Structures are given as C-alpha cells and as structure tokens.
Amino acid sequence: IEKWWGNRWDRINGLLMVGGEILAKMTPPYNLTGKDFEKVGITFASSGNGYQKGTKSSRFGRIVNSIGGSSSTYTCDYLWWNAGITAVALVGGNCNNGENCGADYLNLNNSAGNANWNIGASNFFSYRSV
C-alpha cells in the first residue's frame, strides 16, 4: 500500500516505465534511464488510462497489468501511463481530486522533470559504514 491518504504524489525512484515496459530496481543507485533495472514483465502499448483490473505479484510487489475495472470493482484505483516517454512512478494521489488517489493508484504518465504543487520530494538516505 502506498500513500494511503492520497494527499500528494510521491515519486518511487526504483519504478520506471521505459517505452511502455515497467522496470524496477530495489536498491540504489537509481537512474532515470532504466540502466541496471530489471524487467517486471508488464508492458503497456501506446498511452492511456483507466481503472485497474488485473495485477501481477512478484518480488517487486503487486503492480497493475490491465485496466477495465471501475470505481466500484477490482482495486477501484486508477492508472495513467505514457509509453512514449521515460516515466517515473508517482503513487498516492492529490488532494484536489478525490478520484486521483488511492492505495493502489499509479501514475506512469510523467517524466522526472514534472513539477507541481501536489508532487512531493523523493527522499532517499543511503548509510555507508566507515
């Protein structure tokens, strides 16, 4: 479950969509190209949006793999994606639209350069023992 309250988007550094294919990386260092990321086994053609229907569970977690649900069926959360860009995952939602939030809401529709008042910072702390 990510961002249960849905009050702002947060970036997930280790989850990208590159050319429609979802890639994941569980540990740093992260990048914005997908280099050294692993294929999750989920690909979306073109671009689109819709209520989530199916999900795939793997060691990367549970990730949406199909749309066709509604606001009252399946996960009841939405998915936006853009297969034409390298998109950094946004999770949570935003407080200015009640339908743009939820425990499973996923946005793969924006590049890392996207900035808005409703997008939080990507906090990351790496501890190195000396």
Segments (PLM) and residue ranges:
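Short, acidic, Ser/Thr-enriched surface-loop or helix-capping motifs
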Residues: 3
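C-terminal, surface-exposed recognition/capping segments
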Residues: 7-17, 33-130
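A short, polar/charged loop-to-alpha-helix boundary motif
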Residues: 18-28
